[in-house]
Regions:
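Single conserved hydrophobic/aromatic residue that forms the stacking wall/gate
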Residues: 1-16, 20
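Active-site catalytic microenvironments in core metabolic enzymes, especially phosphate/sugar-handling
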Residues: 14-224
């Protein structure tokens, strides 16, 4: 039987984006998307056996002709499309400076910004359209804010060394709550998923505008 060429070899007429890839792949296929842009890709470091659920997802993508593009850390730290930059902008922060080096990249942004803690939380919740969880280790009046989106709660110690009194991230292990209290830092968990929606949305919108194609965001929240 002769199969038609995959859609991805015929040009892209529609794009969709999401933070994760798992069930979103099937949603994108059902929506007849040509290009799926995700933050967390299919493959990570090292060799990986392709079987079970992973095999099914890859096969479904190939059979449908849908291309998948993923960008993890580079998307977190990008100066224009990055999660850190875009979340900061949505909160109302400007003039950030990079901090915390990881494998040659500065993965965080810090800001001099005086604000009451209650007001900052309100601005963050407005930016993500959701609720945050606070470890109230620092003072009510905030002077320096650090941001690393995703699962960077364990970096609260590095943030404290930078003189950051309020650290915003997505999530962290249980011990990071008490660690923040010990360090005298306000640690704000904004949700791993919600804090990483900014970049993929921006890229999809940019591609849609530049190439005049339909783009959409496939929301598949985890609540974490």
């Amino acid at each position: 039987m002769i199969r038609r060429p995959p859609r991805s070899t015929q040009g892209v007429s529609s794009a969709a984006s999401d933070v994760y890839k798992r069930q979103v792949i099937y949603k994108a296929i059902d929506a007849k998307v040509d290009l799926l842009i995700v933050h967390h890709g299919i493959f990570w470091e090292g060799a990986q056996k392709i079987d079970g659920a992973l095999y099914k997802k890859i096969k479904a993508s190939i059979d449908s002709g849908m291309a998948i593009y993923s960008s993890h850390i580079p998307l977190d730290v990008h100066s224009k499309f990055g999660n850190n930059t875009l979340m900061a902008k949505a909160i109302g922060l400007k003039g950030g400076k990079p901090f915390l080096e990881w494998k040659g990249l500065k993965i965080g942004l810090q800001f001099e910004y005086k604000i009451k803690r209650k007001q900052l939380i309100k601005q963050i919740e407005n930016s993500i359209n959701g609720k945050v969880h606070l470890a109230p280790g620092g003072k009510e009046t905030i002077k320096r804010i650090g941001i690393i989106t995703g699962g960077a709660g364990s970096e609260v110690k590095a943030a404290a060394k930078e003189g950051i009194d309020t650290f915003i991230t997505g999530e962290g292990a249980h011990h990071t709550f008490t660690l923040a209290e010990e360090l005298g830092v306000n640690l704000i968990y904004a949700g791993h998923y919600l804090s990483e929606t900014f970049g993929v949305k921006k890229i999809a919108a940019h591609i849609g505008e530049k190439f005049k194609i339909k783009n959409t965001f496939i929301d598949h929240p985890t609540g974490l």
